[in-house]
Amino acid sequence: AIMRYVRRQHSMIIGQVTAEEIKIQIGEVYPRNEELTMNVKGRDYKTGMPKMVTVSSKEIYEVLRRPARMIADEVMAVLEQTSPELVSDVSENGLTLTGGSAQLWGFAELLMERTGIPCILADDPDSCTAYGCGKSLAWINNMEEGPINIARKRAMKSGL
């Protein structure tokens, strides 16, 4: 989304690495009090020559706002289909955010506002998701045969 925005608004082509740097340094999904700016280097869309523009956090907010809200909506959808016991546990203990996007300015606040559930950032959000997936491989056979998954499979087959 950031690459497309820079191309359309600034007539400049940037790569994925630069887009990620923009997201990390000035990205926000919840408005902050101060506006940040960043000089971004790329290639002019028309001439192909090197070009530099200044991009603001307010611009990036407009780019990231919709995808972040879509993620929040999906979290809400999952919570709505989660068992009452688990939702009670989650509402008491909060949501732990993982992954790179969890570190976006205001992401925890956005989710907290939408769900009403406290959100915290994991200690090592970039790698804890992969670590957890690796640990879960030890339990994969049990997970396939567990009563919850059997009930889920039945519900999915019946179209619920």
Question: Whereabouts are the PLM-identified features?
Answer:
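Residue-level signature of catalytic and energy-coupling elements of molecular machines
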Residues: 2, 75, 97, 133
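Active-site lining segments that contact anionic ligands and/or coordinate catalytic metals
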Residues: 35, 92, 116
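Glycine-rich phosphate-binding loops at beta-strand->alpha-helix junctions
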Residues: 31, 87-111
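Acidic, glycine/GT-rich loop-and beta-edge segments that sit at the periphery of enzyme/chaperone cores
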Residues: 15, 135, 139-160
